[in-house]
Amino acid sequence: MFLAQEIIRKKRDGQPLSEEEIRFFINGIRDNVVSEGQIAALAMTIYFHDMSMPERVALTMAMRDSGTVLNWKSLNLNGPLVDKHSTGGVGDVTSLMLGPMVAACGGYVPMISGRGLGHTGGTLDKLEAIPGFDIFPDDNAFRKIIQNVGVAIIGQTSSLAPADKRFYATRDITATVDSIPLITASILAKKLAEGLDALVMDVKVGSGAFMPTYSLSADLAQAIVGVANGAGCKTTALLTDMNQVLASSAGNGVEVREAVRFLTGEYRNPRLLEVTMALCVEMLLSGGLAHDEADARAKLQAVLDNGKAAEVFGRMVAAQKGPVDFVERYDSYLPVATLSKPVFAEQTGIITAMDTRALGMAVVALGGGRRRATDPIDYSVGLTEMARLGTRVDGQQPLAVIHANNEDDWQQAAEAVRAAITLGNNAPEETPVIYRRITE
């Protein structure tokens, strides 16, 4: 039997916590026998004293085990359970293509996703732009979709890692959100509760990233890879660029439209293709679905070219109560803003930098994201035809097309877009789309 205050005291004094102490505290959070003040105190001691790798693994496992851990054995699936998690960005719509692509190659992708957070878009918000799409199927329906379709994208239910919800809410109001051991445990508790064989992390770097610097992004990626592998889930991470909007669009309906066009081959943004392919390659390799990178790329290209990936996406939408002909008729189903017109720079020049975070906040201000958890979402608004770094802009080449529902909103968004984009005389040095691969 332990006392919560003694566990806090031990960590306060810089001593490592045992697996049993960590599990006791986390179960206490779940069972409401540990107070908010005690959670806040432990979070702050971890923030200042960090955690060893064994402590980080124990914390993650305890948070995972605070609720249901999915078990797929009874389904006798003939392929690996694999997933991807992104630290979030703007125009980061990879999940919508990646899940179907990997499923079309023989993987099973039970993706539990989130809402938009701050300037970053949320996969669930994007999918809810599809009429009727059910992000909370019951457990039986979820399992059936995975078995029959190979991929489902759903929201987190209250039974998955419940301790994390309470822990995170306390961190949010005590300035302890940006603690790497706590971020790692929060991300992985939910992902490992999916019962995965393998996971790939997409950790963003740059002006639209969760972490403010490259070195902190790299630290987070290494921490997640180390802890997840320590917890028995084969995990790799890619550090990818978020110094500009990843897709050509940012918003909800507009990103779903781009995802369908990507899958059908109508249009594939080169940067989005590079990141999506690289993440899918990791999933195929970690899941044993390909011999090497070349084999993985060939398989993925084949399911794009022969239409299998688009077909799987359509089947997933139908299985989750969306329209059965969504892929064929997406334009007739997705909401359209009343006002769509381009915004131009006030002078001629070359785009040398983008404040990607500010562009994400411009979408939020249009109604495409939430300032408070209770805010409604406008699925029709957003940015499309985003100019890229190094593009020369003038009276003919716009910065973006803004989709708004009134002139005032359009004007505010236009000001925000202009302010977020820096022009100069010389093209910026090209940054890699993928900076680094982390395997341990």
UniProtKB/Swiss-Prot annotation:
Keyword Glycosyltransferase in record: yes
Record's keyword terms, sorted: Glycosyltransferase, Transferase
Pathway terms, separated by semicolons: Pyrimidine metabolism; dTMP biosynthesis via salvage pathway; dTMP from thymine: step 1/2
Reactions mediated catalytically: thymidine + phosphate = 2-deoxy-alpha-D-ribose 1-phosphate + thymine
Cellular component terms per the entry's GO annotation: cytosol
Origin superkingdom: Bacteria
A biological process from GO: thymidine metabolic process
Annotated disulfide bonds: none
A GO MF label: 1,4-alpha-oligoglucan phosphorylase activity
EC nos: 2.4.2.4
Gene3D superfamilies (alphabetical): Nucleoside phosphorylase/phosphoribosyltransferase catalytic domain, Pyrimidine nucleoside phosphorylase-like, C-terminal domain, Transferase, Pyrimidine Nucleoside Phosphorylase, Chain C
UniProt family annotation: Belongs to the thymidine/pyrimidine-nucleoside phosphorylase family.
NCBIfam families per the UniProt record, alphabetical: PRK05820.1, T_phosphoryl, Y_phosphoryl
Name this polypeptide is given: Thymidine phosphorylase
The species this protein was found in: Yersinia pseudotuberculosis serotype O:1b (strain IP 31758)
